[in-house]
A protein has these predicted regions:
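Outer-membrane pore/translocation modules
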Residues: 107-230
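Outer-membrane beta-barrel proteins
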Residues: 29-33, 93-95, 139-146, 151, ...
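Residues that define the transmembrane beta-barrel architecture of outer-membrane proteins
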Residues: 40, 81-85, 128-134, 149, ...
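Outer-membrane beta-barrel biogenesis signature
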Residues: 17-70, 146-147, 161-163, 184
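Transmembrane beta-barrel strands of outer-membrane/channel proteins
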Residues: 44-50, 101-105, 153-159, 199, ...
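Outer membrane beta-barrel transmembrane domains
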Residues: 57-59, 63-67, 222-330
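Repeated loop/turn-to-beta-strand initiation elements of outer-membrane beta-barrel proteins
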Residues: 42, 97-101, 136, 146-148, ...
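Residues on the lipid-exposed face of transmembrane beta-strands in outer-membrane beta-barrel proteins
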Residues: 46-48, 87-91, 101, 136-140, ...
């Protein structure tokens, strides 16, 4: 199948591994990295993803939250509901060169207990809808002597277009007139400019209905703001697809994610970690060049870094998530 490069970014993944549980479904929904679409001038993908982080984890184990004791600190004993709506545009300049842009809308509802020494423990909440960080990539497809296989790489940039000033209510009773800042890792944006390097390979097995792909993405902040640097991350996907009929295709992915700890004065030391997820899904052709698709992702392994100074302070994690979407080619 003749395909062109699509940026091998896991664009539905952002800010995974933070104490507030600001994670998203990490499934790969870029079809030409998987050899599932033909060359087209423009492709448009609209995707919704959902993850509810309500399991506190330290290392690979579930842990119990601290008990209120008037510590004037946050206790992550409740939940974070993460939703994202992604609009992904991919345009072919030449048969070998593409450009792509991802524009996310972040919808997040985070609650935790504030352990006040003045009023006693109470629930704080931050709920918002806001633009996330936009990503732009230039992509190149390598020549291949095999018509059933393809590979490529990409170089991109994540721009600091998302807000970093969201707050929680009510504020700290000790400072009732001062807005209480939401943790930086749970903001719509990171405030950083990141470089993105991706690569992929796909192969439709000869004399077989099966096809498979592998893709990876490295992300690293090169410019930061306000004493906060998100940790470097690496995502790796391995997947397979099988056509049940001309219109219905079964999908299966194994998604691995590795993220270093955030750093800076405004970073939470309880951040970063690694995970391995299994993601079965389906894609259905509803009209010429138009597909509907869906995935459910289940965590096989989750490891959440703890705060070295406070081993009892873990991170909220999501045991499962899902993504649904529609894509159309022109």
């Amino acid at each position: 199948m003749n395909t062109k490069l699509l940026f091998a970014a896991l664009l539905c993944t952002t800010n995974a591994y933070a104490s507030c549980g600001s994670s998203f479904c990490s499934v790969n929904t870029h079809w030409d990295t998987q050899g599932l679409v033909n060359d087209d001038t423009l492709r448009v993908d609209l995707r919704y993803s959902y993850a509810k982080a309500d399991t506190l984890r330290g290392g690979s184990s579930k842990i119990s939250p601290a008990q209120p004791a008037g510590s004037d600190t946050e206790i992550e004993n409740l939940r974070t509901i993460n939703q994202m709506l992604d609009l992904d545009l991919d345009y072919s300049i030449t048969p070998k060169w593409n450009v792509a842009m991802d524009m996310p809308l972040v919808m997040r509802d985070h609650t935790h207990t504030f352990d006040s020494s003045i009023s006693g423990p109470f629930v704080q909440e931050s709920k918002f809808n806001g633009q996330g960080d936009v990503r732009v990539a230039a992509k190149y497809k390598f020549d291949s002597a095999e018509h059933h296989a393809g590979s490529g790489m990409s170089l991109g940039i994540k721009l600091p277009t998302g807000a970093i000033d969201k707050t929680m209510t009510p504020p700290d009773p000790a400072n009732p007139t001062t807005p209480y800042a939401l943790e930086r890792s749970a903001q719509p944006g990171t405030g950083s400019t990141d470089m993105l390097l991706g690569a992929y390979y796909h192969n439709d097995i000869e004399d077989s209905p099966w096809g498979w792909f592998a893709s990876g993405l490295l992300q690293s902040a090169v410019s930061t703001r306000d004493d906060y640097r998100p940790g470097n991350s690496f995502n790796l996907d391995l997947g397979a697809h099988y056509p049940f009929s001309p219109a219905l295709t079964g999908l299966l992915q194994l998604n691995a994610q590795f993220k270093y700890r955030d750093t800076g004065l405004n970073a939470n030391p309880a951040s970063g970690g690694h995970s391995l997820n299994l993601s079965p899904g389906l894609s259905f052709v509803v009209a010429p060049k138009t597909n509907l698709y869906g995935f459910v992702q289940v965590a096989l392994l989750q490891y959440a870094n703890i705060d070295p100074a406070d081993p009892g302070a873990g991170q909220l994690t999501a045991p499962w998530s899902f993504a649904v979407g529609v894509n159309h080619s022109y």
